Amino acid sequence: VPDLYDDMLNTFSPKKNAAFEFCEAVYFLAYKDDKVVGRIAGIINHRANETWQKKEVRFGWIDFLDDIEISRALLDAVSEWGKSKGMDTIQGPLGFTDFDAEGMLIEGFDQLSTMATIYNYPYYPQHMEKLGFEKDADWVEYKIYVPDAIPDKHKRISDLIQRKFNLKIKKYTSGKKIAAEYGQAIFELMNEAYAPLYGFSALSQGQIDQYIKMYLPIVDLRMVTL
């Protein structure tokens, strides 16, 4: 599933992406015989580096033909840029934040990818290994089948927890109302819940405002419960 073109342009634009409050980036294309044969983004997330006490340059949005010289040239370009900025380690694929697609597919190439994940050909991780990169973390995707009826045990546990903690379920008919009443709280909760995740950096107020405006008014309310 390819990215939406306008979304990608907005992500790469300092005028459109609030992550540039604490990130800087550079973009490279690889050419061979006057044809584009690869691309890569280099990113320094200063907030993440401060949080995790590291000096890392990230690479993301990497694509290349099956030619080791192309992949080497792309990654060398980001490495050299990172060194010029005082970084001592390169990691990726990562984006500006955890809301960008991350990681590299190493199995499940026969499965349909989603817009929230990265698809790449099997030769991609092979190139990374040949270039001396090592896996540092695993992201695992699961397919969960929802039963036609809620199991009685799950229903009893749900009822018990709701009574014990006085929990109530709220459903909305307006994305704008969710944004107005709970938008700030939703993303503050995400900052707290996502804090232990690999390479996470807390969303700034500018990013929270941006995501509230981008996503909450258009969410599928059938999928949202508070």
Report the location of each language-model feature:
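Acyl-donor binding region in acyl/amide transferases
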Residues: T51-A137
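Short alpha-helical segments and helix-capping/turn motifs at coil-helix boundaries
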Residues: T11-K16, C23-F28, I43-N45, A73-V78, ...
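Acyltransferase donor/substrate-recognition loop-hinge adjacent to the catalytic core
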Residues: I118-G199, M223
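Generic, well-ordered alpha-helical scaffold segments in large soluble proteins
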Residues: I43, A77, W81, L189-A193, ...
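Conserved GNAT-fold acetyl-CoA-binding loop/helix
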Residues: V1-P14, A195-K213
